[in-house]
A protein has these predicted regions:
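Short, flexible loop segments at the rims of nucleotide/cofactor-binding pockets, characterized by
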Residues: 124-129, 153, 183, 226
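Proline-centered loop/turn at the N-terminus of a beta-strand
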Residues: 147-149, 225
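N-terminal helical cap/lid subdomain that shapes the substrate entry/recognition surface
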Residues: 5-6, 11-132, 144
Length: 256
């Protein structure tokens, strides 16, 4: 048993589950770069087929916000870009390409090709940035032997790679992506699988995430504490809301 202090309040836990994007790493820094590349590849691909590109018609489908000259500057935390899987995003964009006149098979092929190109550009840039206070908090967890796992809508291989870029992958006993479950967030399967992997009960587990989907998954799985991070104005389903990891702490050794 470990005592976790959140906003000065104490909770007894045996482990922590973390969402990845927007929770461990800065969402906009990583996925903004990916989206910018993806949209540009889509624009070029459609232009080659004689299809006019109206950016707002595409971005509003995913819930991404952009500057007048194009770069992504924000996103809807309730939207598919924030909460959906890569396959969700692919299906939404392919549906739009189909409505633009492409046969479904060609629409899927175009979006998948653009997605692969965007991922390759991300590998070149490595734009991942840790949230403030994360490294300190993970080290404190390690000092207490607290088991940790990641539960993400991203694919497991990609998630592991992003955490490796940050130099934090070794902190997690397991990383569970959307490809390892039959039903992704907000279904509780991912959280329950993570708890089983760590050998802990959901009722003794904290979950940290940045979307309502994370909180819904945690509640459905029966975790004892849901913590919303970086969510101004609160987050539905969160027991506690913090701006960053500086609001999380542990009592000095010997006091827990």
């Amino acid at each position: 048993m470990t005592m976790l202090l959140v906003n000065g309040r104490a909770y007894e836990i045996d482990g922590i589950l973390f969402d990845k994007d927007g929770t461990l790493l800065d969402f906009l820094g990583l996925w903004g770069a990916w989206a910018d590349c993806l949209y540009e590849r889509l624009r070029a691909g459609l232009a080659a087929l004689g299809i006019e590109w109206r950016m707002n018609e595409w971005t509003e489908l995913l819930g991404t916000f952009h500057a007048a000259d194009g770069p992504m500057i924000g996103y809807d935390r309730k939207g598919p870009f924030a909460m959906g899987s890569i396959d969700d995003v692919t299906a939404i964009l392919a549906g739009k390409a189909y409505r633009c006149g492409l046969p479904w098979n060609e629409a899927l092929e175009l979006v998948r090709s653009c997605r692969i190109q965007a991922a390759a550009e991300l590998d070149r840039m490595r734009p991942a940035r840790a949230l403030p206070g994360l490294h300190r908090f993970l080290e404190q967890c390690a000092q207490r032997g607290l088991p940790l796992a990641v539960v993400t809508a991203d694919d497991t291989k990609e998630a592991r790679k992003h955490l490796h870029w940050l130099g934090i992958d070794h902190h997690f006993a397991d990383i569970i992506g959307n490809d390892r479950v039959s039903r992704g967030k907000p279904d509780p399967e991912m959280a329950r699988l993570a708890c089983a992997s760590l050998g802990i009960e959901p009722s003794r587990t904290a979950l940290i995430g940045d979307t309502a989907g994370d909180m819904q998954m945690g509640k459905a799985a029966g975790v004892s504490l849901t913590i919303g991070i970086g969510a101004p104005g609160g987050l539905p389903g969160a027991d506690e809301v913090v701006s960053d990891y500086d609001a999380l702490a542990f009592p000095p050794h010997g006091e827990a």
